[in-house]
């Protein structure tokens, strides 16, 4: 069923018709231009795991039919919780439309909540589908990959995989802590597990559109922590 849902999502339509700020469709759990090893981007493009989640109506229907046969049902109803901001509600509305139009018998209802309540409900497991986001705290893939370790508070779906846990442990407290190349390879393997099991459905990599006056210089933009730093800003 997870494969059916993720393959039914047309991410390009979401970024082109709803978000419209330069954000790009995402098909990986770690964004582009976050972390580098020997000058190589951990996620040089968004194609590596696209086979597991990119929009494909035929794949979506095939997996959906398999799910219906396995579960012995012809129709499904899922509730998705979403923040009460305009952009999140607009994105959720398109997700609902895409899932219902691609998967016959699928009904998606939306539960709109303040972000604090939505996060709490997801941490409590009081949801079926949830629309959430994550901003990196530091420039390393682990700021994302660490979320899906068993019992992590951000592992909203309560997913658990022993191989994944072992890989992350080796990268954070094990021998790979001092082996940069080995750690890099292990994190990529861990990401592959997450994507192959459809633990999450990546939607888009957020961008920020800013208009800066021609007489203002020195604003710094960063992909982690504070996105904008103004300490060297000068107005001429």
Language-model segments: what does each one mean?
Residues 11-14, 21-25, 33-37, 84-88, ...:
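Solvent-exposed loop/turn segments at secondary-structure junctions
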Residues 15-18, 51-54, 105-118, 146-213, ...:
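Extracytoplasmic/peripheral linker and loop segments enriched in polar/acidic and small residues
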């Amino acid at each position: 069923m997870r494969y059916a849902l993720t393959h039914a999502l047309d991410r390009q339509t979401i970024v082109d018709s709803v978000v419209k700020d330069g954000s790009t469709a995402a098909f990986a759990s770690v964004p582009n231009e976050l972390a580098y090893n020997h000058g190589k981007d951990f996620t040089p493009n968004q194609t590596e795991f696209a086979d597991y989640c990119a929009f494909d109506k035929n794949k979506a229907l095939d997996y959906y039919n398999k799910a219906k046969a396995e579960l012995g049902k012809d129709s499904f109803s899922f509730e998705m919780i979403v923040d009460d901001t305009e952009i999140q509600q607009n994105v959720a509305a398109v997700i609902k439309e895409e899932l219902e139009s691609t998967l016959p018998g699928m009904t998606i209802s939306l539960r709109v909540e303040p972000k604090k309540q939505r996060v709490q409900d997801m941490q409590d497991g009081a949801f079926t589908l949830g629309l959430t986001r994550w901003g990196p705290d530091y420039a390393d893939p682990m700021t994302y990959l660490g979320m899906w370790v068993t019992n992590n508070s951000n592992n909203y779906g309560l997913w658990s995989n022993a191989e994944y846990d072992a890989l992350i442990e080796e990268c954070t407290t094990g021998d790979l802590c001092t082996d940069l190349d080995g750690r890099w390879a292990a994190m990529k393997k861990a990401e592959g597990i997450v994507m192959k099991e459809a633990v999450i459905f990546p939607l888009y990599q957020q961008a920020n559109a800013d208009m800066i006056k021609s007489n203002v210089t020195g604003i710094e933009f960063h992909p982690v922590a504070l996105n904008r730093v103004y300490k060297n800003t000068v107005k001429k």
